[in-house]
């Protein structure tokens, strides 16, 4: 098998007949010719991305994603002595707080928006997941000097040239916390764009799969966070099941199936515990930016009916991120369904699109004919 590192899939097309191959087009990050693969079977493991929810001041320099802060650390960014607030929801905040503390940052507050009772119940359920419980305890010990407050969330970031402080709400009261950096994020969103390009059904924001991890499109399998947020252990088990099924296994291994069921129960508890609270919607003012790429404020989209209208009238979702940041935010704020997915799935060079067009032409397809409008 050929292995291509440093490449991103930009288009994937389902065959017109059962005996025809799938066509997958990828682009190399460092240049070079596009990669075109004809495959009998496709396994999607597209992972997830951070979910950002708008609030006043979230576009200030110094406000970064929780996962983004971790990536900056790995790239050598300097946090020594900087006052950091970490706010949002989910277990990812703990290892990031530990990493920042280890890098010399002063973590002055970790604000978890989930209610205290819900988090306590979730922690008690980890008695059946001793490894996860031990890991969480170790992370907490790593930033023991910083308060970890439940039922607490940032309502505003304040500053001139960059963030200087945040306003936090807790127990019906607000207070100001001085900081140099705000790391924020509200969990993860499954990456389903490639699955939708192939015509796979999506339910509750994740790729729908059978017990063998097969999607609604025959010979296309999916595993990991694309099928729902559940953590590394669940992703690995799903990957084993999907790989075996793609290789011809009729049913998943019974031990793997039991392990998957247990981890899926954990994932459902995770989703219930750390679901963003309704109060976060009320933070967004008329002038608050909801689409950073195109500088679109809430007032410009609040009267519109869906993501398509937002694109037509305001260009929200048409910037560099192609709706990956503002899309989930607008869905949360207004209850909109996900917008239409069109190729390329990732920004691509013209040369790659040309190769894609030549590759799809024999099948009577073009890079722009493969469009999924539903979810």
Regions found by a protein language model. Give the residues of each.
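A conserved FAD-binding loop/helix module that cradles the flavin
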Residues: 223-258
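A Rossmann-like FAD-binding core segment of flavoenzymes
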Residues: 4-26, 103-193, 201-203
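Rossmann-like NAD(P)H-binding beta-loop-alpha module
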Residues: 61, 76-119
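Local cysteine-cluster metal-coordination motifs and their immediate loop/turn environment
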Residues: 286-301, 314-332
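Active-site-proximal substrate-binding core of FAD-dependent oxidoreductases
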Residues: 214-216, 244-284
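FAD-binding core/adjacent interface of flavoenzyme oxidoreductases
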Residues: 1-83, 167-174, 183-184, 194-196, ...
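FAD-site-proximal beta/loop scaffold in flavoenzymes
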Residues: 64-73, 155, 162, 181-230, ...
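Immediate flanking context of iron-sulfur cluster ligation sites
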Residues: 176, 278-287, 304-320
């Amino acid at each position: 098998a050929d292995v291509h590192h440093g490449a991103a899939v930009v288009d994937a097309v389902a065959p017109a007949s059962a005996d025809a191959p799938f066509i997958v087009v990828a682009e190399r990050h460092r240049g070079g010719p596009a990669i075109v693969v004809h495959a009998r079977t496709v396994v999607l493991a597209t992972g997830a991305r951070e979910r950002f929810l708008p609030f006043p001041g979230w576009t200030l320099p110094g406000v970064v994603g929780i996962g983004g802060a971790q990536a900056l650390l790995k790239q050598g960014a300097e946090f020594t002595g900087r006052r950091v607030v970490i706010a949002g929801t989910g277990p990812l905040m703990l290892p990031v707080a530990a990493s920042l503390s280890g890098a010399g940052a002063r973590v002055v507050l970790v604000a978890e928006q989930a209610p205290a009772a819900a988090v306590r119940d979730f922690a008690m359920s980890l008695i059946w997941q001793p490894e996860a419980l031990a890991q969480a305890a170790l992370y907490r010990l790593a930033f023991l000097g910083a308060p970890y407050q439940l039922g607490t969330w940032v309502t505003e970031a304040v500053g001139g040239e960059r963030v200087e402080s945040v306003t936090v709400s807790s127990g019906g009261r607000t207070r100001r916390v001085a900081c140099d950096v705000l790391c924020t994020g509200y969990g993860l969103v499954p990456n389903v764009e490639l699955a939708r390009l192939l015509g796979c059904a999506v339910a509750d924001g994740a790729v729908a799969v059978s017990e063998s991890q097969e999607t609604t499109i025959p010979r296309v399998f999916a595993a990991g966070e694309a099928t729902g947020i559940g953590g590394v252990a669940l992703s690995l088990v799903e990957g084993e099941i999907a790989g075996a099924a793609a290789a011809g296994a009729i049913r998943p291994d019974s031990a793997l199936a039991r392990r998957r069921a247990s981890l899926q129960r954990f994932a459902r508890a995770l989703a219930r515990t750390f679901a963003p609270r309704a109060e976060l919607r009320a933070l967004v003012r008329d002038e608050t930016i909801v689409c950073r790429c195109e500088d679109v404020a809430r007032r410009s989209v609040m009267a519109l009916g869906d993501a398509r209208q937002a694109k037509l009238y305001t260009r929200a979702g048409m910037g560099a991120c192609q709706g990956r940041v503002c899309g989930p935010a607008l869905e949360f704020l207004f209850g909109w369904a996900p917008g239409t997915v069109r190729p390329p799935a990732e920004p691509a060079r013209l040369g790659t699109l040309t190769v894609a067009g030549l590759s799809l032409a024999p099948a009577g397809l073009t890079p722009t004919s493969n469009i999924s409008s539903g979810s």
